[in-house]
């Protein structure tokens, strides 16, 4: 049995979690919208076509903010196509996903869905094929009370009150050559700055995020971020980054270590942003939004493969089926987000339904939870509060990692601790522990020294574990992988101790 220990003190904190840290993402991609959150005629659909069974699972998942409408999709999207009478909305070819977009679900329908789901809206604007003019018009349409062309148009469409969207993304992944009208850092920095300026002139209360590097392996990584922030620093509040964990190599130990790379990624982007601030001698600090993150690799395909399939509406693409192994790596990313709560103030799990998602549906049929549903739901429910600095003593292992996509993906940790953990305290005196045992063979004995908390008792203790790391949840067995009770958590005057199963995700809630 492997032995580890954790020590933390309630007076030593990393930072408070922002509610927007627990966000998700809805893109016009595959069956995320059509057949996902929106399916008129489904037995569970309400009068607006929203699937109630999906809404029930979304409310259980507890996301706080939803990014929309993309993603790659937004770089070619004319937002005006998705408002007004549905029978007058045009169908368009979507060059991002080689699909046909019917536009029967658009901005106003999304705002209604957000209200029904009790989540905040995060809107992205098209800075690919369009620019600042379309962006400021959309802000006026969404947020202005009335008496102008765009605000009165919203009223004529049946939404008399402004939507008051506060968080806006200035484009999507504009450093990527796969993006419609991909730009250099200077080109994007200029258009983002001008769009931001006009958007804030329409509504000075906006929070804006600029596109940082899409991934840590981008050839322009670092230089892109520095140049973009030189143009936008004074006008924005956040810089975005994206990450998708993968196991192309088929190496489970390395896969479970890969969330540590996200730790490095965040630290590096923070350093770049702070260097831009330092050159200005500015007290302002930019925050980070990890507005796309997940496990994704099996359903990645080249664009040429999708072109051959024609231009269907809502094709079943990117429908990653998640395993127990994926849930463990995903849990490691959850821990990473919590441990960077001082600077990562927003994040969006990509995506919400069907498309690389925690929730799956069958058209006309049921909805169910994927394996990754559980770590996110537990993080969102129990991860709100002050993240504490935890001293972890754990054996480490070396992860030999290979990504067949190329050597640029070899930015990997030399050593990874078998135990990855985050500790979150709340104002009521309770504390939640998130514990990932990355040892694939051995149980782990964990002792916890919780200082300045007084006597604590176990309110809740669960483990997510399956003997088959390839186990999945599906329509036939939707609860094959689910949290089970973690027994024998021993509480004493000086702390607590427990034994974790190999390859397991564990959550313990303690209260006075």
Give residue spans per PLM region.
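Non-catalytic accessory regions flanking glycosidase/transglycosidase catalytic cores in CAZymes
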Residues: 1-224, 229-238, 262-263, 267-307, ...
């Amino acid at each position: 049995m492997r032995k580890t220990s954790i020590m933390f003190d309630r007076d030593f904190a990393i930072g408070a979690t922002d509610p927007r840290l627990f966000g998700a993402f809805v893109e016009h991609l595959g069956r995320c919208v059509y057949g996902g959150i929106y399916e008129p005629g489904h037995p569970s659909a309400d009068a607006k076509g929203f699937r109630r069974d999906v809404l029930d699972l979304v409310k259980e998942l507890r996301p706080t903010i939803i990014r929309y409408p993309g993603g790659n999709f937004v770089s070619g999207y004319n937002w005006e196509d998705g408002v007004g009478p549905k029978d007058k909305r045009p169908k368009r070819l979507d060059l991002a996903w080689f699909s046909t977009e019917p536009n029967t679900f658009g901005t106003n329908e999304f705002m209604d869905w957000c209200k029904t789901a009790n989540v905040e809206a995060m809107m992205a604007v098209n800075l690919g094929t369009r620019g600042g003019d379309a962006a400021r018009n959309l802000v006026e349409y969404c947020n202005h009370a009335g008496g102008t062309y765009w605000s009165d148009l919203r009223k004529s469409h049946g939404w008399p009150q402004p939507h008051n969207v506060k968080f806006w993304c200035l484009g999507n992944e504009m450093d990527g050559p796969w993006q419609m009208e991909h730009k250099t850092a200077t080109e994007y920095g200029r258009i983002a700055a001008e769009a931001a300026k006009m958007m804030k002139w329409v509504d000075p209360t906006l929070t804006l995020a600029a596109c940082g590097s899409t991934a840590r392996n981008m050839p322009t990584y670092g230089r892109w971020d520095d140049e973009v922030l030189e143009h936008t620093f004074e006008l924005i509040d956040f810089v975005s980054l994206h990450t998708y964990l993968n196991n192309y190599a088929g190496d489970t130990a390395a896969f479970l270590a890969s969330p540590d790379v996200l730790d490095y990624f965040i630290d590096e982007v923070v350093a770049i942003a702070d260097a831009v601030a330092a050159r200005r001698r500015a007290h302002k600090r930019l925050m980070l939004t990890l507005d796309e993150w997940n496990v994704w690799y099996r359903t990645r395909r080249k664009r040429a493969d999708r072109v051959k399939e024609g231009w269907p509406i809502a094709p079943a693409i990117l429908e990653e089926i998640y395993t127990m192994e994926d849930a463990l790596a995903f849990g490691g990313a959850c821990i990473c987000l919590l441990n960077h709560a001082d600077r990562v103030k927003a994040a969006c799990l990509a995506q919400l339904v069907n498309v690389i998602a925690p929730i799956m549906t069958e058209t006309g049929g049921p909805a169910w939870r994927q394996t990754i549903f559980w770590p996110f739901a537990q993080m969102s429910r129990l991860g709100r509060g002050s993240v504490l600095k935890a001293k972890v003593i754990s054996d480490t292992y070396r992860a030999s990692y290979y990504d067949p996509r190329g050597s640029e993906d070899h930015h990997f940790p030399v050593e990874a601790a078998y135990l990855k953990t985050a500790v979150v305290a709340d104002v009521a005196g309770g504390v939640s522990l998130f514990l990932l045992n990355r040892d694939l063979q051995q149980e782990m004995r964990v002792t916890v020294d919780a200082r300045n908390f007084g006597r604590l008792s176990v309110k809740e203790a669960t483990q997510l574990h399956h003997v088959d790391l390839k186990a999945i949840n599906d329509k036939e067995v939707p609860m094959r992988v689910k949290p089970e009770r973690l027994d024998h958590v021993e509480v004493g005057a000086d702390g607590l101790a427990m034994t974790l199963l190999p390859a397991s995700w564990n959550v313990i809630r303690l209260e006075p």
